[in-house]
């Protein structure tokens, strides 16, 4: 069975996203996607959701 993990990143920057990606993939999670929450008045995302998956048997 496929298991999902969603990590909420409230401080969206290259460094924080890189840290989350490196940390979770080192734990055996596979990167599945990234979604950004935007505010109309700003050009930068206010939040990011990073999605990972792995097989339940790998836990």
Range-by-range predicted roles:
Residues 1-59:
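Terminus-proximal functional modules
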